[in-house]
Each structure stands twice: as C-alpha cells, then as structure tokens.
C-alpha cells in the first residue's frame, strides 16, 4: 500500500480559513500495483489501436484489494488507540465502473471483521468536494491508485504544499519511504526546497 499522511502542523500556513483546519490528520491509502496505472506505458500493457485511439484498463483483483482494505482497517485501529477517529472511508466510483463496484463490495465484506472501526463510502468526485469543505471529519481513506494519486496531492495542498507531504510504500516484507514530491530536480540549487517531507518520511 502507498501511505500518504495529510496532517496539519502547528505554526505552518493553513490553506483553509476554518479553525477546524488545525485538526486535519488524514491518511490516504492507495494500491500501487493495480488500478488504472496498471496499464501505464512503462508496463507496456496499454492497447494502441491507431494514432487516434488508445485504451487503458483499470485492473482490480480480489486478493490485492482485500489486502489493501485489511491494511486500512488495521491502520485505523492503531490510530484509534492514539485518539484518532477510528474511521475508514472507501473512496471510489462504484456507480460507474464495475471494477470500482468490486472494490467497494470487498470493502463492505471486510468491514464486518472490524466492528470497532467506523466504515463509510464516498464517490471520488464527492470526496474532492468534502476534502475542501470538511477534511477534519476523515481519518483513513482507501482508494484505487489514480484516485489516491490525485486526492493525496490535493491533501498536500491543504496543509502547506508538497513540501509537507511524506510517503511510504509498504509491502509485506519491505518499505520504501520518500517525499511525495520525489527528488524535485526542478528546484535544485534554488534555495527553496522544504526538507520537512524528507524528515517526516524518515520518521
């Protein structure tokens, strides 16, 4: 799972004027090996029909999705012990895509194994709105790869920008931790890089 914390820190600029913005403390979870990115050109799995048409596939499998949702609920349990909301929100587009309907179906199956954790669902377009209106009402959010890529960047913007965004890619045996913005070579030598994302990734 790709773990993207979105947390407001004291003495940092807040993008939202509501005083509740100080309470923002979300974790965005996305699955890194499937979803729409599964057919990215780097994997050579997209279908090029001709110069005017290209097809990509959104791949969702039960086994991988079960692991992701289990990870989400177990993370919410740990966070609840530390005083967080103890809530998991499945973010999807189940009303349009069958692959997303499966993603939500598996979520609804697994939530019964964690009765002490609140579980709800939200369409991704509605969540984009909710993250601007009331992000402090969310805890752990779990979603397909491309949705997580987009919404986690939105979350970074809420708490001061990508220089505040850490990232962990956690597998069964290993983890990779890095700033969400990558190496950012475009700002090298300009004396404006924010080191906090790197520090947070290492903590």
Where are these regions (language model features)?
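A glycine- and small-aliphatic-rich helix-loop capping segment at beta-alpha/alpha-beta transitions
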Residues: 1, 43-49, 105-110, 159-168, ...
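N-terminal glycine-rich phosphate/adenylate-binding segment common to multiple enzyme folds
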Residues: 1-55, 146
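Short, acidic/small-residue loops that bind anionic groups at enzyme active sites
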Residues: 1-9, 113-122, 164-178, 188
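Structural motif
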Residues: 2, 24-28, 35, 87-89, ...
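Short acidic loop-to-helix transition motifs that present clustered carboxylates
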Residues: 11, 122-129
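Short acidic, glycine/serine/threonine-rich loops at helix termini
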Residues: 38-43, 99-104, 131-134, 154-155
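Glycine-rich phosphate/diphosphate-binding loop of Rossmann-like nucleotide-binding domains
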Residues: 48-125
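Glycine-rich phosphate/nucleotide-binding loop
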Residues: 130-203
């Amino acid at each position: 799972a790709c773990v993207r914390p979105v947390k407001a820190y004291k003495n940092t600029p807040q993008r939202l004027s509501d005083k509740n913005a100080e309470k923002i403390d979300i974790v965005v979870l996305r699955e890194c090996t499937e979803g729409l990115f599964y057919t990215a050109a780097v994997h050579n799995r997209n279908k090029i029909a001709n110069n005017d048409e290209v097809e990509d596939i959104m791949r969702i499998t039960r086994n991988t999705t079960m692991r992701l949702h289990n990870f989400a609920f177990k993370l919410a349990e740990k966070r609840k012990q530390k005083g967080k909301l103890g809530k998991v929100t499945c973010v999807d587009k189940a009303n349009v895509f069958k692959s997303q309907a499966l993603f939500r179906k598996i979520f609804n199956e697994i939530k019964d194994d964690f009765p002490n954790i609140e579980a709800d669902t939200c369409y991704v377009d509605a969540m984009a709105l909710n993250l601007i209106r009331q992000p402090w009402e969310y805890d752990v959010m779990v979603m397909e790869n491309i949705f997580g890529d987009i919404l986690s960047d939105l979350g970074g913007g809420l708490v001061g920008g990508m220089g505040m965004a850490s990232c962990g890619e956690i597998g069964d045996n290993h983890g990779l931790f890095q700033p969400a913005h990558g190496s950012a070579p475009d700002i090298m030598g300009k004396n404006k890089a924010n080191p906090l994302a790197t520090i947070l990734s290492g903590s």
